[in-house]
């Protein structure tokens, strides 16, 4: 219980410190995800594992990202992808440079239930177009809009999924213009 309270406090501190801020270090956002995962592991036990992979040429202290961007995606992976799995669930967070460019791609993937083609197509539409009747996809829509507003229209979110194999949500952002000065 004491550890859970400590982790919840750490998570709340991050949320409050970043309320109203434009950018935070990628390292801070990844630390927040690690805290969130530890809290969820208390809830789910050994039903899932987590792996973080960051390319060596990405300086997570210098690279800046919109705060609170990744947690809703990790939460979706747990709730929609892995919650029904009894064991062997896996969430992977991969941070990589896109080719030789100054862009980075952050991919959050799970080995959960995945989606059929029709569900995936609808989710992709919901991410791009606001649908007031669909409350479920509003978080992903908002994340995609935040990315486009802050980084430009060429950036954003992409979703891949295969039924019974899992889902991957990728965010592409610019690393070049978001360096600490």
Residue ranges of each PLM-predicted region?
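Two-component histidine phosphotransfer core
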Residues: 1-160, 168, 172
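Two-component histidine kinase transmitter core
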Residues: 174-178
